Amino acid sequence: MLLGVNIDHIATLREARKINEPDPLEAVFLAKRAGAFQITIHLREDRRHIHDYDVERIVESSFLPVNVECSTDKQIVDLLCELRPHRITLVPEKREEVTTEGGLDLLGRFEILKSRIAQFRENDIAVSLFVDPDITSIELSKELGADMVELHTGTFANLHLMLRSNLPKTPHAIPALEMDRRSLSLAYRESLLTLQKAAQKANTLGIEVAAGHGLNYQNVSEIVKIPEIIELNIGHSLIARSIFTGFEAAVREMVELLGRGD
């Protein structure tokens, strides 16, 4: 299974002081040396971490494929069509959110998504859609002409945290998931089954499958067992681990974990 390294939070650290370091571009070369498959960055409308010049420099300099996550915002879409990264992943976006909270509303935004996908295709850019892991979303992704879907693993990841970590004992416990362990265990197994079914459906329709959101060193072992998923995009847990082990070592460790699913 391939690893896409999301380096947004290197830029988050830079923006905390609003200076010029750490430089996300430096991480691109370290990720390659550690065995990563691609670089993933999110150019948000509010530019809270990655900026336009970051995208330009990374696309121009990276020896690895670059996957840029973005909304359907016209200014951003036009810019990315000029820069031409390897792939675009269209994601939903709310300015008030801490991180992406769910998959795209494919039905409600069908026409704008179709238009943006066509524009990227005209510029020879592959398109992935960040979707909730349900059959309807997969079928709509096929109808829209997506090359790939990235399955939102947030529910699975949150259940894993509440079931198998100390999160329930911290101020960041998830209120909606405060339930007994038996209920958590059942919901956890159901979330895995949902991901498996969505991946299988996409595979039968000829759509490549990636996954991401909330994945870490503790929970990826379950995801690598799903053979239809060929790529994971992981950021926060890698950057968090790198504080203690170094960035290159953190990436290499994750690459090794994903390799166990081959």
From Swiss-Prot:
Active-site residues annotated for this sequence: H42, E69, H213
Residues at which 3-amino-2-oxopropyl phosphate binds: N6, R17, G214, G235, H236
Superkingdom of origin organism: Bacteria
Keywords for this protein: Cytoplasm, Pyridoxine biosynthesis, Transferase
Predominant subcellular localization, coarse grouping: cytoplasm
Catalytic reactions on record: 3-amino-2-oxopropyl phosphate + 1-deoxy-D-xylulose 5-phosphate = pyridoxine 5'-phosphate + phosphate + 2 H2O + H(+)
Subcellular location: Cytoplasm
UniProt-listed GO biological process terms: pyridoxine biosynthetic process
Site (Transition state stabilizer): E150
GO CC terms of this entry: cytosol
Any GO MF annotation of the entry: pyridoxine 5'-phosphate synthase activity
Heme in keyword set: no
Enzyme Commission number, as recorded: 2.6.99.2
Enzyme class: transferase
Pathway participation: Cofactor biosynthesis; pyridoxine 5'-phosphate biosynthesis; pyridoxine 5'-phosphate from D-erythrose 4-phosphate: step 5/5
Pfam families per the UniProt record, alphabetical: PdxJ
UniProt KW Cytoplasm keyword: yes
InterPro entries assigned: Aldolase_TIM, PyrdxlP_synth_PdxJ, Pyridoxine-5'_phos_synth
SUPFAM superfamilies found in the cross-reference section: Pyridoxine 5'-phosphate synthase
Parts of the chain that traverse the membrane: none
Binding sites annotated in the UniProt record for 1-deoxy-D-xylulose 5-phosphate: D8, H9, R44, H49, T99
Function, as annotated: Catalyzes the complicated ring closure reaction between the two acyclic compounds 1-deoxy-D-xylulose-5-phosphate (DXP) and 3-amino-2-oxopropyl phosphate (1-amino-acetone-3-phosphate or AAP) to form pyridoxine 5'-phosphate (PNP) and inorganic phosphate.
Assembly, per entry: Homooctamer; tetramer of dimers.
Similarity comment: family membership: Belongs to the PNP synthase family.
The name this protein goes by in its record: Pyridoxine 5'-phosphate synthase
Organism: Wolinella succinogenes (strain ATCC 29543 / DSM 1740 / CCUG 13145 / JCM 31913 / LMG 7466 / NCTC 11488 / FDC 602W) (Vibrio succinogenes)
